[in-house]
Regions:
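Short amphipathic alpha-helix used as the core "switch/output" element in two-component signaling
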Residues: 42, 64-77
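Active-site beta3 strand of CheY-like receiver
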Residues: 47-53
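CheY-like receiver
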Residues: 123-152
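Receiver (REC) domain active-site loop signature in two-component systems and cognate sites
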Residues: 58
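Alpha4 helix (beta4-alpha4-beta5 surface) of REC/receiver domains from two-component response regulators
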Residues: 21, 65, 88-103, 116
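Two-component/phosphorelay signaling modules centered on CheY-like receiver
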Residues: 14-32
Length: 152
């Protein structure tokens, strides 16, 4: 990855966002903050983070929705999701990995563990390859059909 790594910190508790952002100071990363799932989804499209640090327990648009949204458009190697959560039971952790999460950190957060995970995933991120939307596929097919009809 050539440009500065972009990290999106997502939690519904402001103090947790600030704590995580403070732990990342000193790393060569650009940080954006989201106070919930809806804002996170908005920033996935506009900010296009390389790494998302995501709390699991959020109201309204929850973390599962964010994970599904991200994985519908980005591969694990293109946009890493690191869950940071109080939920430390095996079923939750397994569910997260099955949904495409890259790493899982249990709260309370240990700075060395967080920094290590971010650094590891920062090194492994590849540039995203845009996935074709259904509209683009339809336009491509129509153009291909027109060329066949008109002998182009």
């Amino acid at each position: 990855m050539n440009s500065k790594c972009k990290v999106l910190v997502v939690d519904d508790i402001h103090e947790n966002i600030e704590l995580v952002a403070d732990m990342l100071k000193g790393l060569d990363v650009e940080i954006q903050k989201a106070d919930g799932g809806a804002k996170a989804i908005e920033l996935v499209d506009s900010f296009q983070p390389n790494i998302i640090l995501l709390d699991l327990m959020m109201p309204q648009v929850n973390s599962w929705d964010v994970i599904k949204y991200v994985r519908a458009s980005y591969d694990k190697s293109e946009m890493a999701i690191i869950v940071v959560s109080l939920l430390n039971n095996k079923d939750n952790i397994d569910d997260c990995y099955e949904m495409g999460v890259n790493d899982y950190i249990c709260k309370p957060i240990i700075k060395a563990q967080l920094v290590s995970s971010v650094e590891t995933h920062k090194e492994n991120i590849v540039e995203p390859t845009p996935k074709a939307s259904p509209t683009m596929v339809a336009l491509h097919n129509k153009n291909h059909d027109n060329k066949a009809i008109f002998g182009m």
